[in-house]
Design a protein with these regions (language model features):
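ATP-binding pocket architecture of kinase catalytic cores
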Residues: 58-154
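Active-site activation/catalytic loop segments of kinase-like enzymes and analogous catalytic loops
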Residues: 241-272, 288-301
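Active-site acidic catalytic loop and adjacent metal/ATP-binding pocket
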Residues: 50-66, 99, 198-245
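Activation segment
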Residues: 71, 124, 228, 236-238, ...
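A glycine-centered beta->alpha junction motif in the catalytic cores
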Residues: 71, 114-129, 170-178, 292-301
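Conserved NTP-binding catalytic cores of kinases and kinase-like/nucleotidyltransferase enzymes
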Residues: 1-103, 225-227
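A cross-family kinase active-site recognition segment
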Residues: 128-185, 209
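Active-site catalytic-loop/activation-segment of kinase and kinase-like phosphoryl-transfer enzymes
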Residues: 1-9, 19, 158-202
Length: 301
């Protein structure tokens, strides 16, 4: 039986057509003030495709960043694992922006139907990823992050797998979002792609999965004063180490080769990169594109 036929249709967001409709300004302010802050009424929405994130003005203090998690995407245990990973990284003096904790040490809160968290506001801009010195610095930092990530595994958060990112994504798109005239071509092409992806993964023996950022592109890195602040661990999963490296590369093949050399040189100062994972860059890129298409489909409403 074809693997695409074995996978049940993933659950969509039909039950919650617009999960964020209730996030009115008064709701947002009430949520933040429930934690003991006094808001000054200033609210500024920030870019976030999956959750809802706002800069919230605080009386006589620096604004805070409030993140409201999309209902039914992550469980409470999964979100707490994300937070705990950030706290572990901060304990090792890594430049990560962790959730704010109250006096009881709590970082995840509930208001209405939403889990939410607060974060300290950090300034910065996307790093220049064509600058080799920047890439060396990012490689060193990522090596340190992965040294912490490899200490233990996530118990609740999933892994990046061919089944989840590949076959499940194709099943959703093929069943609901492709015109009939294109369906056969789409399924044929994606079947060939996934066969090639599986072949590449099969050639990497003893592949180790570690806790990773999962979505480490320039938009999730705030660059300031010649260093980086890593933000948004919302997509943290178990994954090969190279998952957090390949999205730092840009340009043509010679440029990416030079960039990768800098990243890996810095990385190896703190954690060993296994060259066998290099053959997974294109398979992981393919899985990301398939997964992204399905992610857009699930958010269609």
């Amino acid at each position: 039986m074809n693997k695409l036929e074995e996978i049940d249709e993933p659950a969509g967001d039909d039950e919650i057509s617009h999960p964020f409709d209730t996030l009115t300004p008064s709701f947002l302010i009430d949520a933040v003030e429930s934690l003991g802050f006094y808001c000054d009424g200033r609210l500024f929405p920030l870019n976030s495709y999956e959750n809802r994130v706002y800069q919230v003005g605080i009386e006589d203090a620096t604004p805070m960043i409030a993140k409201f998690y999309r209902p039914q995407r992550w469980s409470e245990a999964q979100i707490r694992e994300e937070h705990e990973f950030c706290f572990e990284l901060v304990e090792q003096e890594l430049p990560v922006v962790p959730p704010w904790r109250n006096e009881a040490g709590e970082s995840l809160f509930m208001f209405g139907d939403f889990f939410f968290a607060l974060f300290e506001r950090r300034g910065g801009h996307a790093p220049e990823l064509d600058d080799l010195d920047n890439l060396f610095t990012l490689g060193r930092l990522m090596g340190r992050i992965h040294a912490v990530g490899a200490v233990k595994a996530f118990q609740h958060r999933p892994a990046i797998t061919i089944e989840d990112y590949g076959y499940a994504s194709v099943a959703l798109i093929g069943e609901q979002f492709i015109p009939t005239s294109l369906k056969d071509s789409y399924l044929s092409l994606t079947a060939d792609l996934l066969q090639a992806v599986e072949a590449q993964f099969a050639q990497v023996s003893d592949l180790t999965l570690i806790r990773s950022h999962g979505d480490c592109h320039g938009g999730n890195i705030l660059w300031r004063d010649d260093t980086a602040n890593f933000v948004d661990f919302d997509d943290a999963r178990m994954a090969p180490a190279v998952q957090d490296l390949w999205m730092l590369l840009c340009g043509d093949r010679p440029q990416q080769t030079a960039q990768l050399s800098e990243v890996v040189e810095g990385y190896n100062e703190f954690f060993t990169f296994h060259p066998k994972e290099l053959r997974l860059i294109e398979p992981l890129r393919t899985l990301r594109m398939l997964h992204y298409a399905a992610w857009l489909a699930r958010r269609w409403t």
